Amino acid sequence: MARILRGEIRWADLNPVKGREQGGKRPVVIISQDVFNERSGTVIAMAITSQPQRAGFPLTLELSSSILPKQSWVKISQVRTLSVERIGDVLNRVAPEQMERLIEGINEIVGG
């Protein structure tokens, strides 16, 4: 498999799930550092949804309409560690400013 890089938006298989976890085959944004992705056999990612979100930042971040075919939101609270075997093709990547906002959001949620 090609290198998985921080900031990439890739397809991922999030099944099986429990409770309110995001599931199915859907886009995710990779938030873990490249060296972690390369050495661990896993990545840390946030789920993306095309369903309009009522919750704003820091729980969700709306992506620019040009990034994916449908208007989409990153669900910052839906952070998952995934085996690289669950990760598929690259769809696009988020801008560095968007990555900063995602990390800022998770820090607000966990108290960083």
Label each residue range with its predicted role:
Residues M1-G112:
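Conserved functional hotspots at enzyme active or ligand-binding sites that engage polyanionic ligands
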